[in-house]
Amino acid sequence: MITKLLTKVIGSRNDRTLRRLRKIVKEINNYEPTFEALSDEELKAKTVEFRERLEQGETLDKLLPEAFATVREASKRVYGMRHFDVQLIGGMVLNAGQIAEMRTGEGKTLTATLPAYLNALPGKGVHVVTVNDYLAKRDAETNRPLFEFLGMTVGVNVPNMPPQAKKEAYQADILYGTNNEFGFDYLRDNMAFRNEDRVQRERFFAVVDEVDSILIDEARTPLIISGPAEDSSELYTRINLLIPHLQKQDKEDSEEYRGDGHYTVDEKSKQVHLTETGQEYVEELLVKNGLMEEGDTLYSPANISLLHHVNAALRAHVLFERNVDYIVNDDGEVVIVDEHTGRTMPGRRWSEGLHQAVEAKEGVKIQNENQTLASITFQNYFRLYEKLSGMTGTADTEAFEFQSIYGLETVVIPTNKPMIRNDMPDVVYRTEAEKFAAIIEDIKERVAKGQPTLVGTVSIEKSELLSNALKKAKIKHNVLNAKFHEKEAEIVAEAGMPGAVTIATNMAGRGTDIVLGGSWQAKVESLQDPTKEQIDAIKAEWKKVHDQVLDAGGLHIIGTERHESRRIDNQLRGRSGRQGDAGSSRFYLSMEDSLLRIFTSDRMASLIQSGMEEGEAIESKMLSRSIEKAQRKVEGRNFDIRKQLLEYDDVANDQRKVVYELRDELMNVDDISDMIEQNREDVLTAIIDEYIPPQSLEDMWDVEGLQERLKADFDLDAPIKQWLEEDDKLYEEALREKIISLAVEVYKAKEEVVGAQVLRNFEKSVMLQTLDTLWKEHLAAMDHLRQGIHLRGYAQKNPKQEYKRESFELFEGLLEALKTDVITVLSRVRVQQQEEVERMEEQRRAQAEEAARRAQAQHAAAENQLADGEESEGSNQPVVRDERKVGRNEPCPCGSGKKYKQCHGQIN
């Protein structure tokens, strides 16, 4: 009560922020007459002037009013568009490293030009981050004329660019790109072996468009660069055949109850578990199919891989649905559908064998499993920026999460014109069929009035279901979902036409406004070199249609189901009522919808259904509150999952920082001999201590063992026995120094032969390669640790603490292994004379030619045999090999250095 009273008197925090910013808006507006009087050249010269003032110590905040006034004036001259005062406020919020919540149609793209220009002045680069390639290219091309007018360069960062083009793009003052590509470039840079192969420079300032989508919806998705692991496609196929034999059990097993089903499904957490009966039955099937030994159990350490395959296959069949979670494209590939945007994500694959299990289920080609080479979450990537800001139409519901995880405050920016959209209360039906019938009736009414309608669905399957119903009712419509997103811009351009009906999944043309009366720009673009008269005629025609749509009630939004997040519902509603236009929205629900089925109480469900007749709908504030409560519950749970993910990933992130800093150090110095020398001393000391314990008696020394170990691991012939015989006063400390000195001496001799520079380059290369290999193995070990850590809870231990402790031990092991492996390689490397190298190279070439000739002859013989179509007389004689058979994993005799199976073994 007191809080409400105080808010009334002094205003909310948001109101106070807006009041403060409006004072600066007045300051910017005061510059307008002066800047209007400047010539184009004088206005362009402002950029140089601002940069000079920055060098003299002026701050960006001090320059802000003039810089914003410069951009506004340039925009008027280049586009004929003047930034509204609310856009100036939005620009200031972004510059302060905060989140600006701006409604759809309020011009977020133009707003971003203000802080982008200001923060590009120091020359460190600004990244404007969008959700897809189309928006990155569109926004870059839209804003390029404005920035180039002001003397700034603009770049685009999208997938599959040549390395040099990407490097040049990163040198631009303002770079537009997708969140995925920025993250992957960071990972790729940290896998590069030469500085010139890196593309990114420092991460100074980022403006994230659709910030809720990137930092919240996708926060749980790590970016992973992976390489192929071993092939196990046959196992996926064989286990896939077992899953249809399993039966679902509705209730979990407990002490009092043991069902006869084989698995249970937890819809809330999207998990599937084998029951005890299921485990026994699966074991029986595996034994029968020769995949497991009789009497063995699925949970024995030797069968971990089998368990992994069974779980993946079970999840693929039970939890993942075609045309909802994924589609199978024309090339027979399983392509993931983003649950938040409804877009397909080509190139992305589920991990932990799930993708292969889905491929086996669909009967398409099974790709190899992958091994993680480098990984980071969006949460951790974007926290690397010195200053981070974001824009979205819907952030207020997640303001707490932005603040607690990213330290970003959300400021709600007022609309330029008051919002007059009519948001009608939800209507609930008993069944989905009744709900769809009501939606069709509503659409018919709107079409008859000439009112455009956008229907939002939660999946491709639902959008196609509704599309079929509309076809039966003979209602012309467009479908915008992951299957047709190439036509997205075209469909969105027509969605505001009188009587147009558009069905869309969550993607709902996000980032693209639905303009009432259709897009006149699209019509102009379809003409070749249009004249001014043609453009004026198109605009006049558009104005007529625009007014006609407004009279019919503007864009009507129909939601066919509530989403798990209120924010996504608000995004759908936000498509209508842009810039003060008329509009309306309504959600149609049924008791069969997943949100109502899973999250509303049984009492509420039976209460609703008991008083309802077929086709009858219920509208009630109590019900709307109950639905909102269910959504809050889901949002809370998802927030906890993301927070927990971050806490676990923070552990890996700290380790990632150490490894990448070490990599940076290695990349930026030419001489790491001091580091190598220190590592050699540490490694040899540790080994000597194993065989000659500190402060021990000579009887406890294992001299022979030490000599053998030094020879085997470091190719070091240390005559320790002889030294001890020659000097009976040689104690452990002096002996240690003598061994280390000998190792240094031997290494120096190699340096004299090959030259210091060659050896320095070799040291650096070995160190980088070893670090990358160990980091890759460490990531796999961390994955395994993470997957099983929750079981520690059963032993009354805190899983999070245990994870931190064990991952730290693993990391210490990595650092120790790095030292040992590098010193081992450097010690065992043999230096050969040039003549010897040339002789070996000649020998290798001759072997390669001989192997190629032999392979060619075999190939020709095989072709001849096929061409003849019949066996020759002696074809049934056994082939006698006149040389030793080469093993698959042995080096190829051609001398390529590859394994036989990966070289000429493939031909054979």
Swiss-Prot record:
Disordered: where is this region?
Answer: 834-908
Q: How does the protein's chain sit in the membrane according to the entry?
A: Peripheral membrane protein
Q: What are this entry's molecular-function GO terms?
A: ATP binding; metal ion binding; protein-exporting ATPase activity
The yes or no answer to whether the keyword rRNA processing is present is no
Keyword annotations: ATP-binding, Cell inner membrane, Cell membrane, Cytoplasm, Membrane, Metal-binding, Nucleotide-binding, Protein transport, Translocase, Translocation, Transport, Zinc
Any note on cofactor binding?
A: May bind 1 zinc ion per subunit.
Bias (Basic and acidic residues) ranges: 836-853
Name the residues that bind ATP. Q87, G105, E106, G107, K108, T109, D513
Alphabetical GO biological process terms: intracellular protein transmembrane transport; protein import; protein targeting; protein transport by the Sec complex
Where on this chain does Zn(2+) bind? C892, C894, C903, H904
Q: Which domain of life is it from?
A: Bacteria
Chain's role: Part of the Sec protein translocase complex. Interacts with the SecYEG preprotein conducting channel. Has a central role in coupling the hydrolysis of ATP to the transfer of proteins into and across the cell membrane, serving both as a receptor for the preprotein-SecB complex and as an ATP-driven molecular motor driving the stepwise translocation of polypeptide chains across the membrane.
Q: Which family does it belong to?
A: Belongs to the SecA family.
Q: What is this protein called?
A: Protein translocase subunit SecA
Gene name on record? secA
